[in-house]
Amino acid sequence: MIQSESRLKVADNSGAREILTIKVLGGSGRKFANIGDVIVASVKQATPGGAVKKGDVVKAVIVRTKSGARRADGSYIKFDENAAVIIRDDKTPRGTRIFGPVARELREGNFMKIVSLAPEVL
């Protein structure tokens, strides 16, 4: 579960390396975000010459969490790190590549472009 002030790795080539969660979108007073949820975040580390710079406020969708997610069949999926992909307002990724596996729950959130770019969907 991701909450305010959580730091996440960025799993795309938008230029950001690490982001800090500012707010979880989707309802007033919402505290936690899971896989497939959209957050507002600030870029804390960035690579030179990238599309986003340090200090930029961006929207991102969570693609991997350490706490994991429960599936409808009763199984759980967990990852080794917390990671997100920076997106535009129309739910398309800012970068052109996705690094690492993403969870199948992104299909339900209509993030089909991220799912198609990902090397592996678990």
Curated annotation (Swiss-Prot):
The UniProt record lists the keyword rRNA-binding: yes
UniProt GO cellular component terms: cytosolic large ribosomal subunit
The entry's keywords: Ribonucleoprotein, Ribosomal protein, RNA-binding, rRNA-binding
Highest taxon, organism lineage: Bacteria
Gene3D superfamilies: Ribosomal protein L14
Keyword Transferase set for record: no
SMART domains: Ribosomal_L14 (SM01374)
Pfam families to which the protein is assigned, alphabetical: Ribosomal_L14
Gene Ontology annotations of biological process type: translation
GO molecular function: large ribosomal subunit rRNA binding; structural constituent of ribosome
HAMAP family, per database record: Ribosomal_uL14
Subunit composition and interactions: Part of the 50S ribosomal subunit. Forms a cluster with proteins L3 and L19. In the 70S ribosome, L14 and L19 interact and together make contacts with the 16S rRNA in bridges B5 and B8.
Family the UniProt entry places it in: Belongs to the universal ribosomal protein uL14 family.
Function of the protein: Binds to 23S rRNA. Forms part of two intersubunit bridges in the 70S ribosome.
Name of the protein described by the UniProt record: Large ribosomal subunit protein uL14
Organism: Streptococcus mutans serotype c (strain ATCC 700610 / UA159)
Gene that specifies this protein: rplN
